[in-house]
Amino acid sequence: MYFMKNVITLIGLVLFSSFCFASEPLPWQMGFQPPASPIMEELHKFHDFLLYISTAIVLFVAGLLVFVCIKFNARNNPVPAKFSHNILIEIIWTVIPIIILVIIAVPSFRILRHAEKIPEADLTIKVVGYQWYWHYIYPDHNDIEFDSVMISDENLKPDQKRLLDVDNRIVIPENATVRFLITASDVIHSFAVPSLGFKIDAVPGRVNETWTRVAKKGVYYGQCSELCGINHGFMPIAIEVVSKEDFDNWVASKNKVAANGENSKLAAN
């Protein structure tokens, strides 16, 4: 009884820890991070749907191979068959894969359309990739802008995550539709946050866009996902989702800092 109690407690702790850190990659993780946006929820369901189809195909083909090897080996069939084709079988193995592909294509195109069609945004954020950090601009809020650089091991605090946390996070309100306008200044980067279901290339001279909407407060981590130089692995992305009130307070504090900076420049001149 005591042993079972410990086992149940251990399982509970593992599940709880997985829930707490659902917005980041975990050691020995299998599968996707838990979805945190509408697009990722659809991708998650589509992935599971494809897994069922793929498993059925693998089991069917493997079973067919075993059946053929047993039933049609040289011992059971000393005289081999002489026919060269079978029209019915050829029609079947052509039509069935087409049907399977159509079944896969319909939800796939629906998800692509949902991801590509940007809804009316409550907030727009410009994202610019540099070697090797991100620069963010909030054009709807007096052009708040700041660099976001990975926190080095020397400056890392106990509650911060190595190779994931940054000095300045993107901050967005919960349940808000956020549009990202993404480009780069030097080489090609890729703006990717797995739990939010987007991975968009940042290309110099070109603006790509995507969107998200997150209902749950927390911090969601990503990485640059396009090889962009020696420090490619040190370009994390951190998106903090807060309440509308906290977001307004954050905007006010950023604008205040910017205003104080401008006043300091004027006083110096």
UniProtKB/Swiss-Prot annotation:
Ranges annotated as spanning the membrane: 8-28, 50-70, 87-107
Q: Which domain of life is it from?
A: Bacteria
One Gene Ontology cellular component annotation held by this UniProt entry: plasma membrane
List the keywords (alphabetical): Cell membrane, Copper, Electron transport, Heme, Iron, Membrane, Metal-binding, Respiratory chain, Translocase, Transmembrane, Transmembrane helix, Transport
Q: What does this protein do?
A: Subunits I and II form the functional core of the enzyme complex. Electrons originating in cytochrome c are transferred via heme a and Cu(A) to the binuclear center formed by heme a3 and Cu(B).
Per its UniProt record, what InterPro entries does this chain match?
CcO_II, CcO_II-like_C, CcO_II_C, Copper_CuA, Cupredoxin, Cyt_c_oxidase_su2, Cyt_c_oxidase_su2_TM_dom, Cyt_c_oxidase_su2_TM_sf
Q: What SUPFAM superfamilies is this protein classified in?
A: Cupredoxins, Cytochrome c oxidase subunit II-like, transmembrane region
Q: Which GO terms describe its biological process?
A: ATP synthesis coupled electron transport
Catalytic activity annotation: 4 Fe(II)-[cytochrome c] + O2 + 8 H(+)(in) = 4 Fe(III)-[cytochrome c] + 2 H2O + 4 H(+)(out)
Q: What is the lineage of its organism?
A: Bacteria, Pseudomonadati, Pseudomonadota, Alphaproteobacteria, Rickettsiales
Q: How does it sit in the membrane?
A: Multi-pass membrane protein
Organism whose genome encodes this protein: Rickettsia bellii (strain RML369-C)
Query: What family is reported?
Result: Belongs to the cytochrome c oxidase subunit 2 family.
NCBIfam families to which the protein is assigned, alphabetical: CoxB
Annotated PROSITE patterns: COX2 (PS00078), COX2_CUA (PS50857), COX2_TM (PS50999)
Per UniProt, subcellular location reads as: Cell membrane
Question: Is Repeat given among the entry's keywords?
Answer: no
Q: What is its EC number?
A: 7.1.1.9
Cofactor(s) for this protein? Cu cation; heme
Cofactor notes: Binds a copper A center.
One GO term in the molecular function aspect is: copper ion binding
Q: Name one Pfam family in it.
A: COX2_TM
Query: What residues does Cu cation bind to?
Result: H189, C224, C228, H232
**UniProt-recorded name of the protein:** Probable cytochrome c oxidase subunit 2
